[in-house]
Amino acid sequence: MLWLWLGLSGQKLLLWGAASAVSVAGATVLLNILQMLVSYARKWQQMRPIPSVARAYPLVGHALFMKPNNTEFFQQIIQYTEEFRHLPIIKLWIGPVPLVALYKAENVEVILTSSKQIDKSFMYKFLQPWLGLGLLTSTGSKWRARRKMLTPSFHFTILEDFLDVMNEQANILVNKLEKHVNQEAFNCFFPITLCALDIICETAMGKNIGAQSNGDSEYVRTVYRMSDMIYRRMKMPWFWFDLWYLMFKEGRDHKKGLKSLHTFTNNVIAERVNARKAEQDCIGAGRGPLPSKTKRKAFLDLLLSVTDEEGNKLSHEDIREEVDTFMFEGHDTTAAAINWSLYLLGSNPEVQRKVDKELDDVFGRSHRPVTLEDLKKLKYLDCVIKETLRVFPSVPLFARSLSEDCEVAGYKISKGTEAVIIPYALHRDPRYFPDPEEFQPERFFPENSQGRHPYAYVPFSAGPRNCIGQKFAVMEEKTILACILREFWIESNQKREELGLAGDLILRPNNGIWIKLKRRHEDDP
């Protein structure tokens, strides 16, 4: 009887324990939900005075009004900024998450100059499986330490070493474009993107992947497939939960692509580490450095050498994060800027003639490589690129997740709000850019830039978290454009409304950039 009683008592205890555990778990969930609702109600009340684009409904906000298609969504946001241009800021609720849209220089300055508001939007978490917590996605003390460590790697004296790679790949591109001379219009977006990918691979990793020669290579295909999957996931809230995402084919493809990209980068790092060790062993044995076909250094070599203030080197994982980040950030943005430049030059022949004259003054009829001194002389081309990035900023909008309450334009904005900065709209403020839809590189002549608000133009962001690679990007854009425009005259008959602007992380033309090429000098072979 005793054993029976003990057994029954044990079962009761187990049942009681299970019930208690369920009760505790349920209470915890309810408590979390209650805390979220209280926080949501506080934000709703605190941000009520901020002008809203339309009536927002509790919990769903404006989500029911937002367009699901990326092209239509971007056009909708831009339409709001145009409609409410007279207001200092506007508010949207995407579900329970509040967003404030910033498109006036004085308000953008408040966020971008803050040393506290440096956290990227929660959307950037979808980049973390690929990029880890590198310079783009990290926050707080890790970001500050990493930024300080890497900034010297982007000094002009170091970037000059990358110019040979840019020239070589630009010449391959020019040779590829030859077949289109005096032919029908073609979409130049993809070949230019492959050129930018070749440049970033060789400068970041010291690896020539030959994307321009073989655009169907596994690495190239995986890079583009991964980027597309990330963009799609950002727009699909039902894919935001990792376990749920992996239940679908796209989630499994995403995981497979990650493994492929990380394996490629890991192998390149291992090769570079082994090569450096072999060379150091030779030097240590008194045999001198190993013979090498090239003395070029890649960004990877710099990462293998840098140390923090305490003399600590980056780990293998740290290095992979930064190489992958440089790869991701460094080709799409520059490729977009070059394509938009060609479109605008092809649509504005009077501007193109001025560029041609400057190129002739610097290079004559020579086909020699572009030098750093040449780039310094190409001042009008520099203005063309700046004006291109004003009209079509490569990154049309970006966001900060506010880490504390702040005040903008007299309105109190709650902690946790997504502050969405919209360069596409900011750059069209008629106070600083009259006739904003007109393509006028002269806006950026020194005498015409005086008095302009320093935050009226932010193609590379601004403040402490501005783009660390902007000098590299401009150098690449000028070099490739100089090589193309020395050889070809560009014609474009596309109208703006035919482009199909899509504003994901990068501003892209859904319908491509279609141009015609003519040889500039008919007597050239």
UniProtKB/Swiss-Prot annotation:
Record keywords, A-Z: Endoplasmic reticulum, Heme, Iron, Lipid metabolism, Membrane, Metal-binding, Monooxygenase, NADP, Oxidoreductase, Transmembrane, Transmembrane helix
Any GO molecular function: heme binding
Domain of life: Eukaryota
Pathway annotation: Lipid metabolism; fatty acid metabolism
Keyword tRNA-binding on entry: no
Cofactor(s) recorded in Swiss-Prot or TrEMBL: heme
Binding of heme, residues: 329, 467
Cited Gene3D superfamilies: Cytochrome P450
EC number: 1.14.14.79, 1.14.14.80
Listed transmembrane segments: 13-33
CC terms in the record's Gene Ontology section: endoplasmic reticulum membrane
CDD domains the UniProt entry points to: CYP4V (cd20680)
A Pfam family that the UniProt record links to this protein: p450
Compartments in which it is found: Endoplasmic reticulum membrane
Activity regulation statement: Inhibited by N-hydroxy-N'-(4-n-butyl-2-methylphenyl formamidine)(HET0016) with an IC(50) of 38 nM.
GO biological process: fatty acid omega-oxidation
Catalytic activity entry: dodecanoate + reduced [NADPH--hemoprotein reductase] + O2 = 12-hydroxydodecanoate + oxidized [NADPH--hemoprotein reductase] + H2O + H(+); tetradecanoate + reduced [NADPH--hemoprotein reductase] + O2 = 14-hydroxytetradecanoate + oxidized [NADPH--hemoprotein reductase] + H2O + H(+); hexadecanoate + reduced [NADPH--hemoprotein reductase] + O2 = 16-hydroxyhexadecanoate + oxidized [NADPH--hemoprotein reductase] + H2O + H(+); (5Z,8Z,11Z,14Z,17Z)-eicosapentaenoate + reduced [NADPH--hemoprotein reductase] + O2 = 20-hydroxy-(5Z,8Z,11Z,14Z,17Z)-eicosapentaenoate + oxidized [NADPH--hemoprotein reductase] + H2O + H(+)
Membrane topology: Single-pass membrane protein
Functional note: A cytochrome P450 monooxygenase involved in fatty acid metabolism in the eye. Catalyzes the omega-hydroxylation of polyunsaturated fatty acids (PUFAs) docosahexaenoate (DHA) and its precursor eicosapentaenoate (EPA), and may contribute to the homeostasis of these retinal PUFAs. Omega hydroxylates saturated fatty acids such as laurate, myristate and palmitate, the catalytic efficiency decreasing in the following order: myristate > laurate > palmitate (C14>C12>C16).
Classification via PANTHER family: CYTOCHROME P450 4V2, CYTOCHROME P450 FAMILY 4
Protein family (similarity comment): Belongs to the cytochrome P450 family.
Protein name: Cytochrome P450 4V2
Organism from which the protein derives: Rattus norvegicus
Taxonomic lineage: Eukaryota, Metazoa, Chordata, Craniata, Vertebrata
Gene: Cyp4v2
